[in-house]
């Protein structure tokens, strides 16, 4: 069984990411990393808080938060800088 799983947070509803995270922990994964860029950052934060406070209270803790910036190709081939976040959740 894998000890770490990465979930990329994007355009789907927040509940999809919450369910994926809870299922990973129920399958025996010890650490889940939520990664998001741009507008999805707030969705990743909401996912982490919902898992910690509502779905697995007392069992999961937010271990680390990394704030990053990624360079991506924008329209017209120009390079843009986009904010990114990595939230590490671990079983307590």
UniProtKB/Swiss-Prot annotation:
Keyword DNA-binding listed: yes
Gene3D superfamilies attached to this UniProt entry: Alba-like domain (3.30.110.20)
Compartment(s) where it occurs, according to its Swiss-Prot or TrEMBL record: Cytoplasm; Chromosome
PTM field: Acetylated. Acetylation at Lys-11 decreases DNA-binding affinity.
Pfam families given in the database record: Alba (PF01918)
Origin superkingdom: Archaea
InterPro entries noted in UniProt: Alba-like_dom_sf (IPR036882), DNA/RNA-bd_Alba (IPR013795), DNA/RNA-bd_Alba-like (IPR002775)
Residues bearing PTM N6-acetyllysine: 11
Key words, A-Z: Acetylation, Chromosome, Cytoplasm, DNA condensation, DNA-binding
GO cellular component: chromosome; cytoplasm
Keyword Cytoplasm in record: yes
Entry's Gene Ontology BP terms: chromosome condensation
One MF term in the entry's GO annotations: double-stranded DNA binding
Family the entry assigns: Belongs to the histone-like Alba family.
NCBIfam families noted in UniProt: DNA-binding protein Alba (TIGR00285), PRK04015.1 (NF003088)
Function: Binds double-stranded DNA tightly but without sequence specificity. Involved in DNA compaction.
Protein name according to UniProt: DNA/RNA-binding protein Alba
High-level lineage: Archaea, Thermoproteota, Thermoprotei, Thermoproteales, Thermoproteaceae
Gene name tied to this protein: albA
